């Protein structure tokens, strides 16, 4: 099975999907209750699997197996399509990297307290996190690959250990808690959406599978089922162990990843369990940060080269790291906010774009062998949901929806 390309592609999709977004889930769903959290997760999973399968449909018309999404956008919408696809992906990666830097700084700032020392300044921690880990990205793929291999194994071990410690402490009463405000379910949607954003690797998977529609479909279904299962168990553990009222109270005082660690420690009475959650959170966040920043770094390199702009390592380093670092320094507790706006961009790239491409593909190629079920009705419904998700961060900002933690 390990040599099976379909299974290998499924693991690539799962690895891309599972990242720091799952760390935000307990923070954003603290006031929602486990039942509605489960419904939101399953609903968004189904929606993004659907949009992923739309890419499979569209890739039947690709001129080359490794054509990128931007190339397909140019094929059907001209140069403006390529520009929109490229910019939306780049800004999405910037928003994610800003979220990861703020989250990493939050965890690092609280680390000295584990050794009985005073907490580090949040802004200092943010700078240290960015400089130390960013150096691996500047070195290139080899630097990231070597570090990620070690950290990924550590992340799996830490996650298994967290579940081993938390699941036996799950209380049924905690799982039965109802939302403090049902509108929280809507407010959390963009943040949860980023946890299923595997669409950035569609070209690589299509090329690896030789353009096989059947293998591509199965890779998406298997590859997304793995993170869905992991997310459900993670939410079962956090919602089942952490009392809703106490969890919300602690997060109101510290709505960051460090607050999640503190909540785990205070509610369970176990300092050790709190630090295990910190270790897992740190590893998950670091691996996500490295992957996203490598994407930003290499994407900018290609963009600068295409338009004959200076693309030496120094210029690329400044262009890649300065925007998210500035956001993190001016808004050091903005982990959830950055993820929320990343969700807006994710909704465009992972929903609006594939729906638009599929619509044009069906008009120009009405006899393709594979077409996703649901017809145009499903396209319109998914499009409307995508537009609503894109509006949610603004509705929160304008006061029409409640703010989730962070």
Swiss-Prot record:
Transports tyrosine across the cytoplasmic membrane. The transport system is energized by the proton motive force. This is Tyrosine-specific transport system 2. Keywords: Amino-acid transport, Cell inner membrane, Cell membrane, Membrane, Symport, Transmembrane, Transmembrane helix, Transport. InterPro entries: Amino_acid_transport_2, Trp/try_permease_CS, Trp_tyr_transpt. The chain crosses the membrane at residues 7-27, 38-58, 83-103, 119-139, 150-170, 183-203, 219-239, 279-299, 314-334, 335-355, 376-396. Its main location: membrane. It is a multi-pass membrane protein. Belongs to the amino acid/polyamine transporter 2 family. Mtr/TnaB/TyrP permease subfamily. It is found in: Cell inner membrane. It catalyses: L-tyrosine(in) + H(+)(in) = L-tyrosine(out) + H(+)(out). GO terms for molecular function: aromatic amino acid transmembrane transporter activity; symporter activity; transmembrane transporter activity. GO terms for cellular component: plasma membrane. Gene3D superfamilies: Amino acid/polyamine transporter I. It comes from the Bacteria. One of its GO terms (biological process) is amino acid transmembrane transport.
């Amino acid at each position: 099975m390990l040599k099976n390309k379909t299974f290998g592609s499924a693991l690539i999709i799962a690895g891309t999907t599972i990242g720091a977004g799952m760390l935000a889930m307990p923070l954003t769903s603290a006031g929602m209750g486990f039942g509605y959290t489960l419904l939101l997760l399953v609903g968004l999973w189904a929606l993004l699997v659907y949009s992923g399968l739309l890419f499979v449909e569209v890739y039947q018309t690709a001129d080359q197996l490794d054509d990128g999404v931007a190339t397909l956008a140019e094929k059907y919408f001209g140069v403006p399509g390529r520009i929109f696809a490229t910019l939306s992906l780049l800004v999405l990666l910037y928003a994610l990297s800003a979220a990861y830097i703020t989250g990493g700084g939050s965890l690092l700032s609280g680390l000295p307290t584990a050794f009985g020392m005073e907490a580090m300044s949040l802004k200092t921690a943010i700078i240290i996190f960015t400089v130390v880990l960013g150096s691996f990205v500047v070195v290139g793929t080899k630097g990231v690959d070597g570090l990620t291999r070690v950290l990924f194994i550590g992340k799996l071990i830490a996650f298994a250990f967290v579940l081993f410690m938390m699941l036996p402490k799950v209380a049924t009463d905690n799982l039965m808690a109802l939302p403090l405000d049902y509108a929280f379910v809507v407010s959390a949607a963009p943040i949860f959406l980023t946890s299923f954003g595997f669409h950035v690797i569609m070209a690589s998977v299509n090329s690896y599978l030789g353009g096989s529609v059947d293998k591509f479909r199965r890779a998406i279904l298997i590859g997304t089922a793995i993170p869905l299962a992991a997310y459900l168990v993670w939410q079962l553990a956090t919602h089942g162990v952490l009392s809703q009222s106490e969890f919300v109270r602690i997060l109101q005082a510290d709505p960051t990843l460090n607050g999640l660690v503190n909540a785990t420690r205070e509610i369970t009475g176990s300092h050790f369990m709190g630090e295990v959650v910190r270790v897992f959170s740190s590893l998950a966040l670091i691996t996500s940060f490295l992957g996203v920043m490598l994407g930003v770094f290499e994407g900018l390199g290609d963009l600068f080269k295409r338009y004959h702009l200076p693309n030496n390592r120094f210029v690329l380093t400044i262009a890649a790291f300065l925007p998210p670092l500035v956001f993190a320094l001016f808004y050091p507790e903005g982990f959830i906010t950055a993820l929320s706006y990343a969700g807006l961009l994710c909704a465009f790239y992972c929903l609006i774009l594939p729906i638009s491409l599929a619509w044009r593909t069906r008009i120009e190629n009405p006899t393709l062998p594979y077409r996703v079920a649901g017809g145009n009705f499903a396209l319109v419904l998914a499009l409307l949901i995508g537009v609503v998700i894109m509006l949610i961060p603004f509705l929160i900002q304008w006061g029409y929806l409640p703010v989730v933690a962070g």
